[in-house]
Amino acid sequence: MSHNTFGHLFRVTTWGESHGPALGCVVDGCPPGIALTAEMIQVFLDKRRPGNGKFVTQRQEPDAVRILSGVFEDARSNGQRTTGTPISLMIENTDQRSKDYSEIAQAFRPGHADYAYFAKYGVRDYRGGGRSSARETAARVAAGAVARLIIPGVTVRAALVQIGPHKIDRSNWDWAQTEQNPYWSPDAAIVPVWEEHLEKIRKAGSSTGAVVEVEATGVPAGWGAPLYAKLDAELAAALMSINAAKGVEIGDGFDSAALTGEDNADTMRMGDDGQPVFQSNHAGGILGGISSGQPIVARVAFKPTSSILIPRETVNEAGEEIELRTKGRHDPCVGIRGVPVVEAMTACVLADAFLRHRGQTGREHFPLGASA
């Protein structure tokens, strides 16, 4: 299987399967001299860790990360720091139940990657989906923790803004609330509505979709590139690569189609510091594929989890029509744990964009009035 690596200068290769002994990633391109410990990565893995709530998978994984390479500590380094060599991170799987999948070893689960993998490779890991499992995203979150250290002036944070048909009230948006409920919701009032919906879904043995919104602040104007390496194209590709992601929009996204030119254009005035100030952010912080200095805003739509308890019609490898009921432990709403994954992928894209921009121009950005 190819294409397990993403990024250009900041490159991440993930490895491992849902029911294998371990999974992890190799991060290449991290500059030397950056303080890095397992504890700094673990903070973010704990946000994604399964078994933390009633409406996520009950698979109990500690997701304890080990740094196998790429760091060094001696009397001169003032703590453990990156060396500039590949950073290898490993997370052991400790709570697999492969027997839950023995009855579907030859069946293609509707809505899952089973059939597509089999059609391409002629072989597949049916135990939890192998590489197609959301378990793979633990490695992405670990890589994202490293990426954040390369861009310390940038803040990346995400929130759940919709579960099923129920959207937040944006007038209630409060980032502090995302740490006060298990759904990372910025709107406290929507939480009981979501819980009622999720309880109905859980009792029915079904699943539901969700939308995650991510915001990156502190990104200066100038990161990215025109045409074929647009920052929004790189970000959209990274977010679409997340398991169960089915749609991405930047800024106003599809809603911009209903606007007029005068409504959609982000007008500018001069600020007291001599730099332009935008009066709106319909573009989501990216213009012409290059960051504008505005907050970068994107949303990701996650489909309902394909593995559900309700019997469905499908076929098996022998070409027989069968009825399938999936066993195992699965997320009624995979979008809940998608929040830290969306943050991680955004951080990786921005770290890569920063390194590429610095390599091309030698500086972070060109303030208005500055000479090249």
Swiss-Prot record:
Its cofactor is FMNH2. FMN binds at R131, S132, S133, N243, A244, G288, K303, P304, T305, S306, S307, R329. Keywords: Amino-acid biosynthesis, Aromatic amino acid biosynthesis, FAD, Flavoprotein, FMN, Lyase, NADP. This reaction introduces a second double bond into the aromatic ring system. One of its GO terms (biological process) is aromatic amino acid family biosynthetic process. This is Chorismate synthase. Reduced FMN (FMNH(2)).
